[in-house]
Structures are given as C-alpha cells and as structure tokens.
Amino acid sequence: MASPSQQAGTPEISSGSSQCYINNLDYLLQEKRMLVEKFSVSLQVISPVHPGETVFLPRRHPLPCFLDSSRLKPHSPLEELFLRSSLPEQLSFLHNGLLSNLYLHAADCPQPLLQWLFQLLTWPPETSSRAFGLLWDLSIDGLFRQPDEDMHFWCPSLQEVKEVFSSLGAYNPALYPQGPFQHSARVLESEASLDSQDPPQEVALDIKLNYIYKFLTLCLLVRPVSYTDASILDLMELLCRAGLDVGLCLLPKTDLQQLLLLLLERIQEWPGKLQPLCCALSWVSDHHHNLLALVQFFLDVTPRGRQLRSQLSLVIIARMLGQQESLPFSAEKTQLALLSQLLSLMRPSSLRQCLGIETLPSSLGQHSKASAELDYKVCYLCHSLLTLAGVVVSSQDITPNQWGELQLLCMQLDRHISTHIRESPQAMHRTKLKDLATQTYIRWQDLLAHCQPQGQYFSPWKDI
C-alpha cells in the first residue's frame, strides 16, 4: 500500500485516457519552495545608518530645577516676588516674558539665574526654548555692557554640563559614576499639561541638545580658554557619546559638529593631546559602525580636523583588529605605512577567524544559518574598516615621497580584499562590500596619478 506522499505523486488515468496528477498540491508547493530558496536574496544588507547606542533613557516628566536665590538681593518689588515664588510661579515669569523685563537690560545679571536657565534647557521645548532665548539674550547683552579688559562671561563648568546631560536621561556609568538622577515623585502639573503638545521624544531630545551645543559654542567663542585641555577631552568624549544615541541616528548633527570643531581648535597642547583623545574616543562604542559615525562627527575643514579624522580612523581600525597595543603609533612611521600593516589583516577570511571563534552548530540547518550570519558580520565589519581606511588616505596630503606607500596600499587592497569577495545573488552584502572596494581602489589610483613622481610609471602588477 502506498503512502500518502506516494499517492500524491502517482499519476492516474482518467476516462479520457489523459494523464493527470491527483492531489499534487503538496508536491508543487515543495517544488516552488525549493525554487524560491535557490534564487532567494538575503534580507541582511549593510545598513547605511549606524545602529546607535542607548545613551538617554526616556523621561516623561522633567526633573525640578530650583533657583538658588539664597545670596540674591532683590532690587525691585517684582524681582523680590520672583525670588520668593515657587518653581511653577517662577516658570510663569519665564513664559510670560517678565524675566526679560527684570534682567535683560540690568547692570548685572546674577549668575544663579544663568545657571538656572541652563538647567531648564533639559525641560520640554515649551520651556527650554524660552530658557534658551533668555539665556542667549542675557549673555549677549552682558557682552556689550562690560568693558573688554574686565569682561565677565559665565560659562558652565564640565560638571554642570554632565549634570545637564544626566537630567536629560543619560545613564552611562563611565561618565556618571553617581548614577542617573532618579525621577522625582513631584510632577509639575503646569509642565505635565504640555506633554500632548510636545514633539516626539527623539525630536524633543535633539532640540534640547542643540540648545546646549549652541550655548557652549557661544562660550568658546567669547572665552577661548573656558576649559582646560583635560576638560576639553572629557567634554568631547561626553558629546560624542551623546551624539551616538539611538534616537538621534537619523537626525542632522550640524550644531554638534560645529561645537566639536571649535573644541578641537581650543586645545592648547597640540598635537600632544591627539593620541590620548583618539584612544579615548575609540572606546566610546564597541560597534564598528558607531565608531565610523563618530569619525564623521568631525569635519575635515581644518588641519586639526583632518589630523583627528585620520588618526582616529587608524586607532579604531587597530582596535577592531586587536592591534591597538602592538601598533607603534608613536614611532616615526607615516599613517599610510601603519595602514599598510593593518590592511592585510582586514582580509575577510582573517576577520572570519576572529569573529567565528565560537563553534558553529552541529546540525546542518543551524550550521548553514549560522554560517550565513557569520558571513554577513564579516562583510559588515570589513565594510566599516575599509571605509575608515579610505578616511585615513583622503585626510593625507599625498606627496611624491608617499607614492610608493600608496601604491602598496592599492596592491594590498586588490590582493587581500577585492579578490577574496565572492559575490552571490543570495548575499547582497558581499556585492556592497565589493562595490566599496572597487570605488576605494579607483580613488586611490586617481591619487597615484596626481602624485606620480617624475620618471615613474605605475604598474599594478609591479612587485614591491
């Protein structure tokens, strides 16, 4: 007696002597399934957007910000009323524009008020926008009312900036060892009623951060020596962590980039602080794509910006390949020579050995799936590393003396990466990596043509 599956595939003769298959649905579905699997395309593609880090925890209600008025002496009945009022009443002064009437054209603006307004930048946009506008106006107004030789301009300290970021919900233990501020049991009804009018949390967070970035930029422009080199390095690390928040991945970083560029120019001991800064920034995230996005926070419009982009990219590549301790960054080797040492380690097969330390599952189905997942991770990592390698080269002023080093990089790129990528319709991530390798090779060849020494003829087959 035949099994049901056999019966499904057994032809029967109809009365018209024509052959037909009875109950062949299962057989046809299996056949189509095999056909689909054969020509299926993997959904795992290399995303152009970095995954981001969870830096800020969602916070529905703002933390109370109390004005320290213990040392303030009122100069008018209205100011006395403001200083003695509760927080909701003081906020109404801000919303109604009464604070501008009190302090905008006053001879001296009290520093506790400026500190209070800076803390209010972490509140919902309805309040933070007014706080930023008044903080900006008071700061600018003070510049025109003070003589240049005796000018006093308030800038928040590094600790105050950290506290503001913590009020926004930042919880990173490396930056905030005391832990995030706890939610207060007291919720201000005046602000809670505005929640329905507020933009989405990601947009609201971006608005608040941009207010902070703009004011810090103003501080650095007015007082170039506002912070020591050590404080600048810590502040840049804090800002880079904040910029990698997962909710901000798709939002522009214009204000952050301008602030980072200005902080970079304010470092006194340069290039002595370059390597410590790169080492600190290379540990801001453990994901290679996030670190690539971090490099792109720094614009290449100044010599220092290009130096940092190049050195930071090199340090990140070394860290991802486990070579950060062994690579002689302080030696007299050029960055192209150091990159040449790392490029051979970026071979997909070498990366596969590093990422595939764990044994693959024994069953055939799980082994195939795990192998495909590993192949995707290898191509994803190689794509980020190769992009960083392109940043290193593009940040250099290639001279004829470096022609040989760049020629060697072209050969290594073709030998170790391009020829080791086997494209497949089922693995589009390989195609994207292959495209990047080809584009990088073409750009480097173009650089070779422009910096070719006299009497030299470049041959890609020449053995160096």
Swiss-Prot record:
Phylogenetic lineage: Eukaryota, Metazoa, Chordata, Craniata, Vertebrata
Family according to the record: Belongs to the FAM178 family.
One Pfam match: CANIN
Protein name: Protein FAM178B
